[in-house]
A protein has these predicted regions:
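N-terminal Rossmann NAD(P)H-binding glycine-rich loop of SDR-like oxidoreductase domains
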Residues: 1-26
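Conserved Rossmann-fold NAD(P)-dependent oxidoreductase catalytic core, especially the SDR/UDP-sugar
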Residues: 100-146
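Glycine-rich NAD(P)-binding loop of the Rossmann-fold in SDR/ketoreductase-type enzymes
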Residues: 59, 89-100, 141, 145, ...
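Amphipathic terminal alpha-helices
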Residues: 286-312
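NAD(P)H-binding glycine-rich loop region in Rossmannoid oxidoreductase-like domains
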Residues: 50-51, 55-93, 104
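NAD(P)-dependent short-chain dehydrogenase/reductase
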Residues: 159-208, 213
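Mid/C-terminal beta-alpha module of Rossmann-like enzyme folds, strongest
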Residues: 207, 219-268, 272, 304-311
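Active-site Tyr-X1-5-Lys
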Residues: 142-170
Length: 312
């Protein structure tokens, strides 16, 4: 199977390439091509010598054509970052760039396009959603942020190409993803773990819906080349945690003398992950968070101020 990936230098892309190359549970040989920017940090990708790297970006049509030529499946994980860029730049690169990518895929006659969207497409939630009727993939999309609007726009273009019979599409919508990033100090909850590891007191507010990067890459692998996933959307959510409770988990896990202060956040909108579970995606619950805290603490202890890992 020939597979192309955008966003390989990000957290999800980095973990996906490890899963596909080092584990490869598909049962068939994979030929992987990936799009990278010249300015991207790539030390963590040195181990994957068989990957065919294409230099370019979403704003470079020629590189998109080279990326998808001869490919069967395209994973679109890249998102041009904010908030330092203007809204005009973010829309131009992400929406227009993805349209160019989709058009290149049509011309290349790929078989499947997998887009990593986000649950931020739900800015407004219907009053019918409650614990007995959690928000699922059938809920209407009404973005309340620029990021959500960009993701929603791209989803619409994906369905346009599917319904015009250009290729199959599958959408993945994760909530906040935790996992080790190649630049580890950018990893989710890194600073809180770091402060408590040095016995500082921290003030925490709010709450978070979470899912591990392992569950996300499981989902991506399971939908890859899977005809049953054509036209489907999958919500990836493991659970909801108050940041005060998360802080206490960190204290208990790393034996910190730091103290936690603050107030609990809202309970959050109930969300369903039933479709992902039926796909076979496994979720590790709070035990997964504990293991992640241990791993980040170990990396902090091992690498100190050297926050970029070439082997991770």
């Amino acid at each position: 199977m020939n597979v192309a990936i955008t966003g390989i230098t990000g957290m999800v892309g980095s973990h996906l390439i490890k899963r596909l190359v080092e584990e490869n549970k598909t049962g068939e040989a994979l030929n992987i091509r990936a799009l990278i920017r010249e300015s991207s940090l790539v030390d963590h990708l040195k181990a994957f010598e068989d990957v065919d790297y294409v230099m370019g970006g979403l704003e470079d049509k020629e590189s998109l054509t080279r990326l998808v030529e001869g490919m069967d499946v395209v994973f679109h994980l890249a998102h041009y970052p904010g908030p330092v860029q203007t809204a005009d730049e973010l829309v131009k690169v992400n929406v227009n760039g993805t349209f160019d990518l989709l058009e290149a895929c049509r011309k290349a006659r790929i078989k499947q396009f997998v887009f990593m969207s986000a649950c931020t497409v739900f800015g407004q939630v219907l009053p019918t959603v409650d614990a007995d009727h959690p928000l699922d993939e059938s809920h209407p999309v009404m973005p309340g942020s620029l990021y959500g609007a960009i993701k929603s726009s791209i989803e619409s273009f994906c369905f346009f190409y599917q319904r015009s019979r250009a290729f199959d599409i599958t959408l993945i919508r994760p909530v906040t993803i935790y996992g080790v990033k190649p630049q580890i100090d950018k990893s989710e909850w890194f600073n809180t773990i770091d402060y408590l590891a040095t016995n500082y007191n921290v003030d925490l507010k709010g709450s978070t819906k979470y899912v591990s990067v392992d569950s996300v890459t499981q989902a991506l692998e399971k939908v890859m080349g899977n005809a049953d996933c054509s036209g489907k959307i999958y919500h990836l959510i493991d659970g909801h945690i108050h940041n005060l409770d998360l802080g206490q988990m960190i204290v208990d896990t790393i034996d910190s003398f730091g103290e936690i202060e603050g107030v609990k956040g809202e309970e959050g909108v109930p969300m369903s992950n039933q479709a992902a579970r039926e796909l076979g995606v496994e979720f590790s619950g709070r035990e997964g968070i504990v293991e992640y805290i241990k791993l980040v603490h170990k990396l902090q202890t091992t690498y100190g101020g050297d926050r970029i890992l070439d082997q991770w």
